[in-house]
Structure formats: C-alpha cells, structure tokens
A protein has these predicted regions:
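Short, flexible catalytic-loop segment of classical short-chain dehydrogenase/reductase
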Residues: 71-81, 85-86
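Active-site loop-to-helix junction immediately N-terminal to the catalytic Tyr of the SDR YXXXK motif
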Residues: 32-40
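Active-site-adjacent segment of SDR/Rossmann-fold oxidoreductases
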Residues: 15-16, 31, 52-64
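Active-site helix of classical SDR
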Residues: 9, 42
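C-terminal helical subdomain
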Residues: 68, 86-124
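Residue(s) in the substrate-gating loop at a strand-loop-helix junction
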Residues: 26
Length: 147
C-alpha cells in the first residue's frame, strides 16, 4: 500500500510527463482503525506523501499532477466477510461502480483532492469534532463485533 505506489510515482515524476496520476486513499488515513493498524499507517503515509508531492510539483512548474481521492468502505473482497459485516455490510459500503463514476467526475472537474461521497465527507467532518482517541475507541468497539 505504500512502497510500490511511491516507487511508481517517483519513476513517473522523474520523466516530468504531462499526466494526472490518480492515487486512492482511505478514511483510515484520517483516523487510524484498530485491527487495521498496518493498513491505516500505510494509507496515512501514502496520503501525506501525495499531498507534499502535489505542492513540490506545483512549485517546480511540473506538468504532472497527483490527484488524491479519499474513499470510505467500498464493496470489494479486501476484507473477510466477518469484517465486511462489521463495516455495515453492503448498505454502508459504496459500490465500485459509483466510486469510479465519482472519481471520473472529480477528474473532469479538475479537482486534485477530494473525499469521495457525501456520507464520507460528513464522517471526515465529524471526526474533526471529537478527540481522536474517542473516535478510535468507538471504531474499535464497532469493528470488534465483526471479529
């Protein structure tokens, strides 16, 4: 989740091509999730790298753009069924098709950073209101039900 994308981004950046590189991140980058510690850390590192690189490229006058889009849970096979159920099952997860359509829309609008989906933007906003420790405890209790 971190090393391979960074290596690829560096190789493309060295060529200074006129290209938009799309990198997907996750809400876990904004608030670490218990039971997903390594995933949370890798997404946070990748997100931080991309945000810093966006500014570096802008200051250099590079034609390359790094677009960073943050997603909440998307219906994929990445998580075991028990954890998917703990994440609210399919009703709380965005479909892959909707996620793809929204990302394409953001690219067409020229947006280089966004939290994809109203529900997930609301969650990110709410996470700013409470102390992070409280949020981590709530998420841990919620996820533990599915393990």
């Amino acid at each position: 989740n971190y090393q391979a994308p960074i290596r690829l981004i560096k190789q493309v950046a060295e060529r200074n091509c006129k290209i938009r590189l799309v990198q997907l991140s996750s809400l876990v980058a904004l608030c670490p999730h218990p039971y997903l510690a390594a995933y949370s850390a890798s997404k946070a590192a990748l997100q931080t790298y991309c945000l810093a690189l966006q500014e570096e490229l802008r200051l250099k006058g590079s034609e390359m753009r790094v677009c960073l889009y943050i997603l909440g849970p998307v219906r994929t096979a990445i998580f075991p069924p028990e954890l998917q159920n703990a994440l609210g099952g399919s009703q709380l997860q965005m479909s892959q098709e909707i996620a793809a359509r929204r990302i394409i829309g953001l690219l067409q609008q020229g947006r280089s950073y966004a939290i994809v989906g109203k529900r997930y933007r609301l969650l990110a906003w709410l996470m700013k209101l409470l102390p992070q420790r409280w949020i981590i405890r709530l998420i841990g209790a919620y996820l533990r039900k599915g393990l």
